[in-house]
């Protein structure tokens, strides 16, 4: 099963966010706030999916307070390149029940 999840280009099934995923979300929070012109008091990663490319894309559902959620895509380059995480996409005005999909 693990090998199926790691196929290049495929998106994994949604999983509960881990401390590592929360750390990834926290690192790109300033990028999202700059793009959306909003400040998020709460920024709690709930679930995530990953996609292996030349590096890894992380699709993360983030609870930002009340009934509000955002979906973000974070690119992590190959470890040996030692580059910072990059926010490459986002969707605002999402709900708890909105499916986390490729966008």
From Swiss-Prot:
Protein name: Cystatin-A5
UniProt record similarity statement: Belongs to the cystatin family.
Keyword Cytoplasm: yes
Entry-linked CDD domains: CY (cd00042)
One cellular component (GO) term of this entry: cytosol
Domain of life, per lineage: Eukaryota
Region described as Disordered: spans on this chain: 1-20
Cell compartment(s), UniProt: Cytoplasm
Lineage: Eukaryota, Metazoa, Chordata, Craniata, Vertebrata
Major localisation: cytoplasm
Keyword Cytoplasm: yes
Site-annotated residues for Reactive site: 10
GO molecular function, one term: cysteine-type endopeptidase inhibitor activity
UniProt keyword annotations, A-Z: Cytoplasm, Protease inhibitor, Thiol protease inhibitor
Species, as recorded: Sus scrofa
SUPFAM superfamilies from the UniProt entry: Cystatin/monellin
Family annotation (Pfam families): Cystatin
Motif Secondary area of contact per record, residues: 51-55
InterPro entries linked to this entry: Cystatin_dom, Cystatin_sf, Prot_inh_cystat_CS, Prot_inh_stefin
Main function: This is an intracellular thiol proteinase inhibitor.
